[in-house]
From Swiss-Prot:
<dbReference type="InterPro" id="IPR011006">
    <property type="entry name" value="CheY-like_superfamily"/>
</dbReference>
<keyword id="KW-0597">Phosphoprotein</keyword>
<comment type="function">
    <text>Member of the two-component regulatory system NtrB/NtrC, which controls expression of the nitrogen-regulated (ntr) genes in response to nitrogen limitation. Phosphorylated NtrC binds directly to DNA and stimulates the formation of open promoter-sigma54-RNA polymerase complexes. Activates transcription of many genes and operons whose products minimize the slowing of growth under nitrogen-limiting conditions, including genes coding for glutamine synthetase (glnA), transporters, amino acid permeases and catabolic enzymes.</text>
</comment>
<dbReference type="GO" id="GO:0045893">
    <property type="term" value="P:positive regulation of DNA-templated transcription"/>
</dbReference>
<dbReference type="GO" id="GO:0000987">
    <property type="term" value="F:cis-regulatory region sequence-specific DNA binding"/>
</dbReference>
<dbReference type="GO" id="GO:0006808">
    <property type="term" value="P:regulation of nitrogen utilization"/>
</dbReference>
<dbReference type="GO" id="GO:0001216">
    <property type="term" value="F:DNA-binding transcription activator activity"/>
</dbReference>
<feature type="binding site">
    <location>
        <begin position="168"/>
        <end position="175"/>
    </location>
    <ligand>
        <name>ATP</name>
    </ligand>
</feature>
<keyword id="KW-0238">DNA-binding</keyword>
<keyword id="KW-0678">Repressor</keyword>
<dbReference type="GO" id="GO:0005829">
    <property type="term" value="C:cytosol"/>
</dbReference>
<dbReference type="InterPro" id="IPR002078">
    <property type="entry name" value="Sigma_54_int"/>
</dbReference>
<feature type="DNA-binding region" description="H-T-H motif">
    <location>
        <begin position="445"/>
        <end position="464"/>
    </location>
</feature>
<dbReference type="Pfam" id="PF00158">
    <property type="entry name" value="Sigma54_activat"/>
</dbReference>
<feature type="domain" description="Sigma-54 factor interaction">
    <location>
        <begin position="140"/>
        <end position="369"/>
    </location>
</feature>
<dbReference type="InterPro" id="IPR010114">
    <property type="entry name" value="Transcript_reg_NtrC"/>
</dbReference>
<dbReference type="Pfam" id="PF00072">
    <property type="entry name" value="Response_reg"/>
</dbReference>
Length: 469
């Protein structure tokens, strides 16, 4: 199999230069173009094995170019590149038939590997993707690699109604992802029905899911449709599926197998066509081992797994998320959006965020109301944010350790708006160590220097700098 011919189109000459040399270094023949019109003109006489195209270019953008290429050369794999790493870009690229999606900045070795995979795909004459364009936008934001993986999965599932299991800590945005999977699916125009298993009393879950007949139990005065019937033709999102009682799990498994169920108190089967998206913050494999979750139901639901990372594992997304939530809160309250001081933005990025994206969103709502000025300063942030971060960072330390005390001091200083903490702390640290060492050696400087790991001249200089002569 020959190495392959690659075309690159990007209005950024530096991107063209880097890719051309990297691809040539991998033994591939590379030709570069500045705009989409040049590519279409060249395609009239020859065809590459793969095309890499930027998504935002003057004149014809990457998606418009992709559309024309798919009309003329439907088997040609196209990789869409973009510095604007958002869900809509990923989904639009996949739905118009892109082979894959490459967010900038990219690792050059990964880019070359992706190109080689696309060439192999083309040379083996596999069928392309060709799906209708996307639905409404969502508020899923993420440039972190883990979130790009989530976008990629949503894009690849955009023509499917397969079951999906979403797992992630509380507050990571599992329902947002479920909505996105529904919006970008063939069922987008049908209902999306959500039900949180943890929020429903156990004795009402069956009635909520499957409905009930009139007279099925005390208070059942009319026939009631359950969530399965309400979601017919669409998507049923079962949040916190790990909390579902075992007897209801058995009924759910039967519905997934047969496509029909009986209302509570009913004798006539009700047929439904429903896609199931389930979510949990629990370890379902462990629940299966403990006998708290049916293994056969787990395998029914776990066809495609989507893992949502906690916010602490995607810190690069925090500034963009915070700006977005401040804009949303301002629109809701009819006020001007707050701005984040650069130091505040940096502080938000360092915090623990045990409540994940939901906690960040609520913090931005709080700041919109409570921050005094138009620009949010560090001292405007609620104190509990720092307390949770200190608690997490010192959880492995002894309560009276010097590191714990230092962390608590730094926390108080940052909350008071102090800057240049190191220049403030280092002299005090050295003064404390010197005083203690000299006390330990009864004032013998050479011995104190040895204990501290300094030379005698260094100790003499430090005593002078610190005013301790």
């Amino acid at each position: 199999m020959q190495r392959g011919i690659v075309w690159v189109v990007d209005d950024d000459s530096s991107i063209r230069w880097v890719l051309e040399r990297a691809l040539a270094g991998a033994g591939l023949t590379c030709t570069t173009f500045e705009n989409g019109a040049e590519v279409l003109e060249a395609l009239a006489s020859k065809t590459p094995d793969v095309l890499l195209s930027d998504i935002r270019m003057p004149g014809m953008d990457g998606l418009a170019l992709l559309k024309q290429i798919k009309q003329r050369h439907p088997m040609l794999p196209v990789i869409i590149m973009t510095a604007h790493s958002d869900l809509d870009a990923a989904v639009s690229a996949y739905q118009q038939g892109a082979f894959d999606y490459l967010p900038k900045p990219f690792d050059i070795d990964e880019a070359v590997a992706l190109v080689e995979r696309a060439i192999s795909h083309y040379q083996e004459q596999q069928q392309p993707r060709n799906v209708q364009l996307n639905g409404p936008t969502t508020d899923i934001i993420g440039e972190a690699p883990a979130m790009q993986d989530v976008f990629r999965i949503i894009g690849r599932l955009s023509r499917s109604s397969i079951s999906v299991l979403i797992n992630g800590e509380s507050g990571t945005g599992k329902e947002l992802v479920a909505h996105a999977l529904h919006r970008h699916s063939p069922r987008a125009k049908a209902p999306f029905i959500a039900l949180n298993m943890a929020a429903i009393p156990k004795d009402l879950i069956e009635s909520e899911l499957f409905g009930h007949e009139k007279g099925a139990f005390t208070g059942a005065n009319t026939i009631r449709q359950g969530r399965f019937e309400q979601a017919d033709g669409g998507t049923l999102f079962l949040d916190e599926i790990g909390d579902m009682p075992l007897d209801v799990q058995t009924r759910l498994l039967r519905v997934l197998a047969d496509g029909q169920f009986y209302r509570v108190g009913g004798y006539a089967p009700v047929k439904v066509d429903v896609r199931i998206i389930a979510a949990t913050h629990q370890n379902l494999e462990q629940r299966v081992q403990e006998g708290k979750f049916r293994e056969d139901l787990f395998h029914r639901l776990n066809v495609i797994r989507v893992h949502l990372p906690p916010l602490r594992e995607r810190r690069e997304d925090i500034p963009r998320l915070a700006r977005h939530f401040l804009q949303v809160a301002a629109r809701e309250l009819g006020v001007e959006a707050k701005l984040l001081h650069p130091e505040t933005e940096a502080a938000l990025t360092r915090l623990a965020w045990p409540g994940n994206v939901r906690q960040l969103e609520n913090t931005c709502r709080w700041l919109t109301v409570m921050a005094a000025g138009q620009e949010v300063l560090i001292q405007d942030l609620p104190g509990e944010l720092f307390e949770s971060t200190v608690a997490e960072s010192t959880s492995q330390m002894q309560p009276d350790s010097w590191a714990t005390l230092l962390a608590q001091w730094a926390d108080r200083a940052l909350r008071s708006g102090h800057q240049n903490l190191l220049s403030e702390a280092q002299p005090e640290l050295e003064r404390t160590l010197l005083t203690t060492a000299l006390r330990h050696t009864q004032g013998h400087k050479q011995e104190a220097a040895r204990l501290l790991g300094w030379g005698r001249n260094t100790l003499t200089r430090k005593l002078k700098e610190l005013g301790m002569e």
